[in-house]
């Protein structure tokens, strides 16, 4: 069996993000009070792409925030003695705003739970929605994405990697086969 398998190429990624952008606009009836927040790291890249798509469609550049959830994780003590902390930058008031959280992959649901908790510590949004490029299943919490690029059934012996130019000099999604469960 192959160790890596491509499940989405650059064009498929682009089309999925364009579709998600249209779905966000449709569900929210436009851009009023709408803001995007990308979850560090690859969620930020995908949020920027959605922001660009919406700007091309509506002619409006949505506010975009960057969220690091490191200290909100329920597995922080298991990660490392010195976890890598990225920046959080949300330069707009989130109170009474419709926030679309963006991430690359949803697996157990724990990352988005932490992101929601972090947002709630910053204010009281009118609504929080969740957009994700890949939903791989295996939820451990009662959380689902509002916008999904692709549902990809996986086993616990697989890892989904979303590759983006900004970090990987590539745009595609691959599944890596492991020898053990995660």
Swiss-Prot record:
It is an enzyme of class 2 (transferase). The keyword Acyltransferase does not apply. It holds the Pfam family Pribosyltran. Regulates transcriptional attenuation of the pyrimidine nucleotide (pyr) operon by binding in a uridine-dependent manner to specific sites on pyr mRNA. This disrupts an antiterminator hairpin in the RNA and favors formation of a downstream transcription terminator, leading to a reduced expression of downstream genes. It catalyses: UMP + diphosphate = 5-phospho-alpha-D-ribose 1-diphosphate + uracil. Its EC number is 2.4.2.9. The keyword Electron transport does not apply. Keywords: Glycosyltransferase, RNA-binding, Transcription, Transcription regulation, Transcription termination, Transferase. Gene3D superfamilies: 3.40.50.2020. This is Bifunctional protein PyrR. One of its GO terms (biological process) is DNA-templated transcription termination. Homodimer and homohexamer; in equilibrium. It comes from the Bacteria. SUPFAM superfamilies: PRTase-like.
């Amino acid at each position: 069996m192959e160790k890596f398998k491509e499940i989405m190429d650059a064009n498929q990624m682009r089309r999925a993000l364009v579709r998600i952008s249209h779905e966000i606009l449709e569900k929210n009836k436009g851009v009023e009070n709408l803001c995007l927040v990308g979850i560090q790291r690859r969620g930020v890249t995908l949020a920027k792409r959605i922001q660009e798509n919406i700007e091309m469609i509506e002619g409006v550049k949505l506010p975009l925030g960057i969220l690091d959830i490191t200290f909100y994780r329920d597995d922080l003590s298991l990660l490392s003695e010195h976890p890598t902390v990225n920046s959080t930058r949300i330069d707009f008031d989130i109170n009474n705003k419709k926030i679309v959280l963006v991430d690359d992959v949803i697996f157990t649901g724990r990352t988005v739970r932490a992101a929601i908790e972090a947002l709630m510590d910053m204010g009281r949004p009118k609504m929080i929605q969740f957009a994700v490029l890949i939903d791989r299943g295996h939820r451990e919490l009662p959380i689902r994405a509002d916008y999904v690029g692709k549902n990809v059934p996986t086993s616990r012996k697989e890892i989904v990697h979303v590759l983006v130019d900004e970090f990987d000099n590539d745009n595609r999604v691959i599944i890596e086969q492991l020898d053990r469960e995660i």
